[in-house]
Design a protein with these regions (language model features):
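N- or domain-start disorder-to-order transition segments that initiate the globular core
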Residues: 36-74
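Active-site-facing alpha/beta catalytic cores
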Residues: 40, 99, 112-277, 298-299, ...
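Metallocofactor- and cofactor-centric catalytic cores in central/energy metabolism, strongly enriched
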Residues: 62-69, 87-90, 95-99, 106-116
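Conserved phosphate/anionic-ligand binding catalytic regions in large, soluble enzymes, centered on
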Residues: 81-91, 356
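Conserved, mostly hydrophobic/aromatic
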Residues: 85, 294, 360
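Internal helix-turn-beta structural module
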Residues: 337-375
Length: 376
């Protein structure tokens, strides 16, 4: 239309309709993007590492620990792994206290057992609600603060390593966050709800530490085995804004944690028959370094935390009387803290879990010595 030309009423109506349509579209897009509030830009993993570096002594000890752990998974060492600790690392003082107690026991069983403390700082939630771990809430009674969470976790990890020389295990709930702690962690677990996720599998393929794949809550072992196969293979994919390639992780392995059927009933999978079946499936797949860790809690114990003692003893008995199991079962995963059971956030009982119930210290110490007695 030429400048100064008049428009008809019909043209004006059509133009106004188009304007309203476009405005409505862009408004909807604006509302959609406004559902995300970009609160603040967080430091990159490298920036966090530069601010809170790993001292040379700790880095050397980590390398030594990693080498020994690798030998357990490749069969070069016959030491037995105990990945043990609280359901969630909720309090720095109590967690450090607990791990220092573990260090005393480790010294007494070091010829047979290699302990990796569970320092779980991310908690998957079935509905997405509730306490999500130290990453989200470094103080469980205060509002979420993810930046402070990253700093608190790194500080806790470094303090544990400095004061005990222990390696550290955590769950990889968010694959994009792994790089914040890749210079510290010595063992990573992929949870039952994450094991089917492609990004978890692909990132695991680029890690040079053991990654344990839990069976899904359904109990379908083929899903877990597919995850192990993916992790043991090389891939090209998008990660943290980079086009990356991985070579595969030959010490990715299985974790049996029990299952839940369609009626909500827990189905254990720690018995001899379950482990034997998994071994046969492993061999058929031709995976490198066949290995399994048995989780004594969760659906294996029906979350009856004291059952972990009986379950551990049964597994150790089977290992003692089966050469196949002796080479295949590399260790146990046990949920343990200072006090028995669990509590609600704010109850204030020192060293008591605020998530799943855990075995208390007295029972834990006794159980570790019992496990050592089973080992030749």
């Amino acid at each position: 239309m030429m400048p100064g030309a008049k428009i008809s009423c019909k043209q004006a109506c059509i133009g106004f309709y188009v304007y309203l349509t476009l405005a409505s579209y862009y408004y909807k897009e604006l509302v959609f993007y406004m559902s995300f509030e970009f609160y603040r830009k967080l430091p990159t993993p490298q920036e966090i590492k530069n601010i809170y570096p790993v001292p040379e002594r700790i880095a050397a000890k980590k390398a030594e620990n990693d080498a020994e752990i690798r030998k357990i998974f490749t069969g070069e060492s016959n030491k037995f792994l105990l990945i043990i600790g609280p359901c969630s690392a909720d309090n720095e003082e109590a967690v450090l206290d607990y791990i220092k107690r573990l260090a005393v026991v480790q010294e007494k069983v070091k010829d047979k057992i290699f302990i990796i403390p569970r320092v779980y700082t991310n908690k998957p939630r079935t509905t997405g609600k509730g306490y999500k771990g130290m990453l989200h809430q470094p103080d469980p009674e205060k509002a979420p603060d993810l930046l402070q969470g990253l700093i608190t976790i790194r500080h806790l990890f470094l303090k544990i390593m400095d004061e005990t020389d222990f390696p550290i295990a955590d769950e990889m709930l968010y694959p994009e966050n792994y790089r914040y702690f890749s210079d510290i962690l010595s063992y990573v677990a992929i949870g039952a709800r994450s094991v089917e996720n492609q990004q978890h599998r692909l990132v695991s393929s680029g890690m040079d530490i053991p990654v344990g794949m839990k069976n899904p809550t359904s109990g379908d072992l083929s899903i877990m085995l597919n995850s192990i196969e993916a992790a043991q293979s090389g891939h090209s994919f998008l990660y943290r804004g980079w086009d990356v390639e991985t070579t595969g992780n030959d010490i990715s392995h299985a974790i049996l944690r029990g299952a839940v059927n369609q009626y909500g009933q827990c189905i254990p999978n720690y018995h001899y028959e379950d482990i034997n079946q998994l071994y046969d499936m492993y061999i058929q797949k031709g995976f490198a370094n066949p290995s399994v860790i048995i989780d004594t809690n969760h659906s294996n114990s029906n979350k009856q935390y004291m059952e972990q003692v009986r379950i551990a003893k049964e597994i150790m008995h089977n290992i003692k009387h089966s050469d196949k199991m002796k080479g295949f079962v590399k260790g146990l995963m046990i949920e343990s803290y200072i006090e028995d059971g669990c509590q609600k956030i704010g109850d204030g009982v020192y060293g008591k879990s605020i998530t799943d119930p855990c075995l208390g210290w007295d029972a834990t110490e006794k159980l570790i010595y019992t496990i050592a007695d089973y080992l030749e």
